[in-house]
């Protein structure tokens, strides 16, 4: 079976460095809020060219903490609205509602599956305070029009950068496009930890200081709590692992691009709609390679029977989840269409040539 993503094989490439990093942490006797977290934060902010990076427990917390930070700073309050794509993983929406803010769903573009920026302005009200963009599947969601809308309406732009570390727009990396960005280092991400981890980047010093306290029980100084915070800290051992893997992220994203370009070049089946390649290849890091087909279940079973594992990102849109039953009667037809059709093919930095050839051959014979 060709795995959708072979995490063991990916991490095996760096096993000696990862084991050395683990031993270093064990021998140090310091497991939280130490030198390795500080080192990784510096490496991440330098990589993104951002002023600040704060390591946190996971990607959802990263987004939650950004919004909570703005609330503590008086920029947002209960009931304020945040525009968010209707076509996204539910974490993007949970971060908003968890802070007693109101998610306002906006449909995606068929071209990129990202938030349709041309539809944002119609969703803005007097209560709108931010736009939470998602660089879905690894493709940048950004434009001059987005910048102009945010400036015109005095809105914060928050990046959900869980899937697109290393992508660029006009020479600026994701994580440094908006006012703040949340990262996930879930093991399956392009930069994956060996457990849960996340981070926030921002050029706003006040927001950075506020988030750093909020993530540590609301405390700037031990036993003195300014906020009713939470416990969302990256472990030293995960920071050490991520410092090893960050060195290779650019090499790995180039391999992903080459596979995506090959799929687009060699898959020739009129029943399958392939993703668009961006004019500037740097705008996509191909966390996922997502095709569309009307008989998805049949194709997925066919691929499985022929030894190819695939996944669906995502089978149920947020507005159809039980968690948001208040949206049960809402209609977002583009999102629903995509969620019914999309199928993610294997793509990753350790795929063998014969695996890629096999997948292409099977799809062309379908």
PLM region spans:
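N-terminal "arm"/small-domain region of PLP-dependent enzymes with the aminotransferase-like
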Residues: 1-30, 35, 306
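PLP-dependent aminotransferase class I/II
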Residues: 8, 37-42, 47-54, 60, ...
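Phosphate-binding glycine-rich loop
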Residues: 30, 34-81, 95-99, 105, ...
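Conserved coil-to-alpha-helix start sites within the AMP-binding
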Residues: 87-93
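Short beta-strand->loop structural element characteristic of the AMP-binding/adenylate-forming
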Residues: 102-112, 311
